[in-house]
């Protein structure tokens, strides 16, 4: 049996993943972070992005909305603000959120919080990517 690393992805609401995996790629704030079994200890911040991992040659995707990652021992723990597996994502809802964010950014009226609209657009695009729709 090949070496595995334990992956736990947790949000305030639920445990999204709890399994032994071959490899993890996480969206760090400075770029992607690749983690193999027996990785050196690490704590880092995560950005909005796709967490990818492989199990028995199959790649799984989880859309993250930021958070923190810790590698300790032979375990990766992701504490995420929000996380959804690709197959759980409501694609129509994500597309509507993307359209709303783009409309707000196009208007750019004084009452629009541009940063909030940009973050909403990034989250919607990320969810669509995780669902395989982009």
From Swiss-Prot:
Its membrane topology: Peripheral membrane protein
GO CC annotation terms, alphabetical: plasma membrane; proton-transporting ATP synthase complex
Localization of this protein: Cell membrane
Keywords: ATP synthesis, Cell membrane, CF(1), Hydrogen ion transport, Ion transport, Membrane, Transport
Highest taxon listed in the record's lineage: Bacteria
Keyword ATP-binding: no
Record family assignment: Belongs to the ATPase epsilon chain family.
Role according to the record: Produces ATP from ADP in the presence of a proton gradient across the membrane.
SUBUNIT field: F-type ATPases have 2 components, CF(1) - the catalytic core - and CF(0) - the membrane proton channel. CF(1) has five subunits: alpha(3), beta(3), gamma(1), delta(1), epsilon(1). CF(0) has three main subunits: a, b and c.
PANTHER family with a match to the protein in the record: ATP SYNTHASE DELTA/EPSILON CHAIN, ATP SYNTHASE EPSILON CHAIN, CHLOROPLASTIC
Protein name (database record): ATP synthase epsilon chain
Source organism of this protein record: Carboxydothermus hydrogenoformans (strain ATCC BAA-161 / DSM 6008 / Z-2901)
Gene this chain is encoded by: atpC
């Amino acid at each position: 049996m090949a070496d595995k690393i334990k992956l736990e992805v947790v949000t305030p609401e639920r445990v999204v993943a709890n399994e032994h995996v071959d490899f993890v790629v996480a969206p760090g704030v400075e770029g992607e972070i690749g983690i193999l079994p027996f990785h050196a200890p690490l704590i880092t911040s995560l950005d909005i992005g796709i967490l990818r991992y492989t199990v028995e040659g199959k790649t799984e995707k989880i859309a993250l909305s930021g958070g923190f990652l810790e590698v300790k021992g032979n375990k990766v723990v992701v504490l995420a603000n929000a996380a959804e597996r690709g197959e759980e994502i409501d694609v129509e809802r994500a597309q509507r959120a993307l359209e709303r964010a783009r409309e707000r950014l196009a208007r750019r009226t004084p009452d629009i919080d541009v940063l909030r609209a940009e973050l909403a657009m990034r989250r919607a695009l990320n969810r669509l990517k995780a669902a395989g729709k982009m």
